[in-house]
From Swiss-Prot:
Gene name linked to the record: mt:ND6
Protein name per the record: NADH-ubiquinone oxidoreductase chain 6
Entry GO MF terms: NADH dehydrogenase (ubiquinone) activity
Function comment: Core subunit of the mitochondrial membrane respiratory chain NADH dehydrogenase (Complex I) that is believed to belong to the minimal assembly required for catalysis. Complex I functions in the transfer of electrons from NADH to the respiratory chain. The immediate electron acceptor for the enzyme is believed to be ubiquinone.
GO CC aspect terms: mitochondrial inner membrane; mitochondrion; respiratory chain complex I
Amino acid sequence: MIQLMLYSLIITTSIIFLNMIHPLALGLTLLIQTIFVCLLTGLMTKSFWYSYILFLIFLGGMLVLFIYVTSLASNEMFNLSMKLTLFSSLILIFMLILSFIMDKTSSSLFLMNNDMQSIINMNSYFMENSLSLNKLYNFPTNFITILLMNYLLITLIVIVKITKLFKGPIRMMS
């Protein structure tokens, strides 16, 4: 039920994102969509660690984009159109009603048979075990994880060296 609602909210924010013009509104919409995706990822796994790390990475990227956008479009007015608000609220209401209808029909169809219920329970058990975070740090994938950590560290060092205060692209204008 919650996953269907999150799917509908993700689709709604995607449609809103396509209709935005202002860069700060685009960033805010992207941040809200990131929160929804992280909540959905956390609900699909056993723990919220993966979604928390994903959110922090996205938030760091959004902060860098926010710095660039505020230096480019600092004096633009941010106004919200009534047409876009009405359109997005209608889409959201439609998606939520559709998710409620789909949830009731799918649960009544699946609960009619005990065999189907046992298959659903078995499927959820396998999904929980397959999406566990233990696989991320065990033998076959630990090399990829260490490589990704080293790549992020080197990228951080390079970005710090590139964006020195008086020599980088984010320098003070006097």
